[in-house]
Amino acid sequence: MPKYSTEKWWARSSGRLCELARVAISMLAIAAVGVLQPALAAAPKAAASKATEPVMPDLSPWLQKNGEPGQAAWQHAAHFSIAYEIDPGHNTPAPASTQVDAGYTADALWLRFEAQDPHPADIGVHYRVHDGVNSDFDDFVGIFLSPFNDAQWSYEMFCSAGGAEWDAFRQQNNEYSSWDAVWSCTASRTATGYQVVMKIPFASIKFPHSPDPQRWGLIFFRNWPRNLRHQLFSRPLDYDSNCTLCSMEPTRTAAPVTTTPADIQLIPAVTVIRTDTRKDPTEGLAQGSPALKASLDARWVLRPDLEWSATLNPNFSEVAPDVLQLSANRQFALFYKENRPFFEQGTQVFNTPSLRFSSDTFNPSGTLVDTLAINDPRFATKLVGQVGANEIGALITQDTQTNIVLPGPQSSTSQSFDFSTRDELLRYRYDVGASAFGLYASDRDGSGYHSALYATDATWQIDPSDVLTALVGSSSTTYPGAVAGALGTTPGTIDGLLWTLDYARTRHNYNFDLNLSHVADGFRADLGYVPQVGYDQGAFTGEYDFYAPDEEWWQNFAFGTVSNWTRATEGGENLDRKVKLYTALHARYQSRIFLYATRDEQFYQGRIFTLDQYEMDAIAQPAQWLNGEIDVVGGDGVDYLGIRKAQLFSVNTTFYLQPGKHLKIDLVYDYEQLNLAGRRLFTANVYDLRFAWYFTSHLFAQVIGQGQEVRNNTALYPPGTPHHSGTLASQYLIGYQVNPWTVFYAGSSEGYEETVDGQLQPQQRSFFLKGSYYFQPSF
């Protein structure tokens, strides 16, 4: 790899940065007029209300010998009530009583929940590991905690009636369940319900670095699943607002929080794996040699609102595989969720407004930042924090394997290359109330390949109901000859511009969203997920809701539309014109039924296809131990390989079974077929079956089976098309989790592929041990 040069990077990028800066300054000036005026106008009202805000006391004087609050401490705590049902009721009295006591000590926030129940026997209690709580099955309580009280983001921490933890990060209306933290909770049954005690260490959260008392935003929450899933809040919700976090209750600490979080947090990890592979189709698996890999993650809390973290020789091997997605007859690259701890923690600051695609219903949105593009880094480091209203983020990695997606107006391709790249992400955002504006830059460089992207975005919360979002980005990408040849494109440098403007309104009975976008043919986001380029688009979504009176068998009925018009930037062809109408009914047994009718005019490879499709999606929980979803689609489709219209039929099913406290079964099955003039063109099946037995909330065993099978009618396809193909994979695993990063796993996995004679032949077998340990050293 050539030596990385900062001067070279700056020479390439400074001109484009200046160009984007001019655009950014214009956008920020426009945004400031609308953003700052209402924010400043609201300031006196906020100041005047501080005298009536709840105050959390320091519980340290009343701690027991074990360091935990006792009954005397809870009597001195601040008291709250989860008094409102926000769904299905609309700020109606909660059907079950929940009292919350809150306070803090030198190192942690402490919460106690007393959850009463009119029928205690109906409380859903199951063993789960961290993040295993299921809102359809489990009773749980918890908190939305916004330490900066800025209506921009919050932590979510919940504890089930069985003592299992679940946490997430909420950024405005987007929830990221992959975020994890080290905290603890205990749960115990009472004669009239259950009690939960939560301890949230200050070392695990980010909060303002201030000599004054903290002023945090809080909402306490209870999940109460019965015939309907009842969601209970400690604060009333404004249904004419699209800003949930604006409903938080400002709560002060009685004194400044003077604690300094743990300076250093370390997570060493070791993986031992042996992989046997088939080198000759006529022979068995050849036994491999055991390989040991050690890694170290480090987190340094510079101050409560700023942290630096790094990973050396990172261990990114996944214990459980992703749920399979059907890849047959798809236009664009599939999107997968990030599950690697280093990239899950603190990277939400890099998020930018999402993008819409035209005809790809399987991946309806994209993003400028997708850390899965960083495939196999030798090292990675990041700095993230929030100082007042300023949010900052910087991430640098050395990636040893480079994955590149070549997007297009109608399809995308991808290739993996063995050369290394230096990857950099930079983000700055300034928050003003629920509004914000920011700058973003990314750079990827190695072996003659280079991709740079600069962007600016702004969010203007005009009023509680209306929000305007804008994003402008510019990219420059250089493909050397070898890379261009593998991708099937022309060597050289290409540039492109992206912009998107979105206006959304939310009211109690209706909501709508209007979006305009432009993505140039030369635009690239190689450290993001943008598989479609070269289009202009207008899109509209809208819905109107009718709500049932209390005690009815149904909850609400809605009808709406999802429509878009997409035109190619090169040539001006209409790529896609779609109108989708739907109705939806929510009723008892947590049931939801959606009916869709779609007319779609789609342009592909020089042809226009007029497609009519009909869809039914049904979700229900007919029993306390069973939840399922069935989605059926029928009508017209496109055979993208043969470039012809066909008849489509697909069934997608998902079932979750919880027969008892210990056993959990998940089943996903997808079926799809295309027919041409009454003759079967292809049939595809995908299944994912998972059995898990939870001995406790820390110890579990799991078995996973996955398979994909495709059958093609070779008489209707070009010569060389295989008649059938199939894969099968299995995994056996036993795991023990103390917290998200102190874990031990042992297991094995096998992979099979279908041979030309239709037999499944083992191709790979692995045995693995993985352990990691989270600790805070004292120096």
Question: Model features per residue range: what roles?
Answer:
Residues D107-L109, W153, Y194, D212-W216, ...:
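Outer-envelope beta-barrel architecture signal
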Residues P201-H209, C243-T259, L302-L306, G346, ...:
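Outer-membrane beta-barrel proteins
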Residues A21-V35:
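Bacterial N-terminal signal peptides
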Residues T260-S309, F419-G485, E551, I619, ...:
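Surface-exposed extracellular loop regions of Gram-negative outer-membrane beta-barrel proteins
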Residues A41-E424, R429, G448:
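Structural preference for beta-rich elements and adjacent junctions enriched in aromatics
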Residues M1-L20:
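N-terminal secretory signal peptides that target proteins for export/translocation
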Residues Y239-P261, T400-Y454, T459-Q461, R592-V651, ...:
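Outer-membrane beta-barrel transmembrane domain signature of Gram-negative proteins
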Residues D376, S474-F779:
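Exposed, low-structure sequence patches enriched in small/polar residues
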